[in-house]
Amino acid sequence: MGMIHIENRQKNQKIAVETLEKVAQRILNDSECPDAELSLLIVDDIEIQQINRDYLQRDKPTNVISFAMQEGEDVGLHPGLLGDVIISADTAARDAREADLPFESELYFLLLHGVLHLLGYDHERGTEEDARRMEAREAELFARIREEFL
């Protein structure tokens, strides 16, 4: 089983941390990296905007940010460490309301999306085929999450 560290630094949304950890482990298991180490940070819009501005030069809140440890200078330093996923609970709640979905559904989807980025999937900088591949993998894994946790 992997090492999953979850820190909930926001107060606006109720988060079932134990369930979120189980969802994260399911994602790691289904991605064939059950022993990987993952850090998950749940924040509000103010904090994610600061992170987005400071690290990605985008001065606005966003739903999820991923920082992979197996990229750039850090490759090979900690082979089991996937990286960090940061989710804005405020944006997730807003997006869930707009889509008429439960908050947990959006939260689990964003966790999955972030982990797939850590595993090298890319829908932004890659080709259309890369985006389709990521979307297909998301659909496949999220169907399993829905079945088990929602």
UniProtKB/Swiss-Prot annotation:
Binding site for Zn(2+): H113, H117, H123
GO cellular component, as recorded: cytoplasm
Gene3D superfamilies: Metalloproteases ('zincins'), catalytic domain
HAMAP family per the UniProt record, alphabetical: Endoribonucl_YbeY
Keyword terms, alphabetized: Cytoplasm, Endonuclease, Hydrolase, Metal-binding, Nuclease, Ribosome biogenesis, rRNA processing, Zinc
Lineage of the species this protein comes from: Bacteria, Pseudomonadati, Thermodesulfobacteriota, Desulfuromonadia, Desulfuromonadales
Gene Ontology BP terms: rRNA processing
InterPro entries according to UniProt: MetalPrtase_cat_dom_sf_prd, YbeY, YbeY_CS
Enzyme type, top EC level: hydrolase
Function: Single strand-specific metallo-endoribonuclease involved in late-stage 70S ribosome quality control and in maturation of the 3' terminus of the 16S rRNA.
Cofactor: Zn(2+)
Protein name: Endoribonuclease YbeY
EC number: 3.1.-.-
Protein family membership: Belongs to the endoribonuclease YbeY family.
Species annotation: Syntrophotalea carbinolica (strain DSM 2380 / NBRC 103641 / GraBd1) (Pelobacter carbinolicus)
Cofactor: binding comment: Binds 1 zinc ion.
Localization of this protein: Cytoplasm
Broad class of where this protein is predominantly found: cytoplasm
GO MF entries: metalloendopeptidase activity; RNA endonuclease activity; zinc ion binding
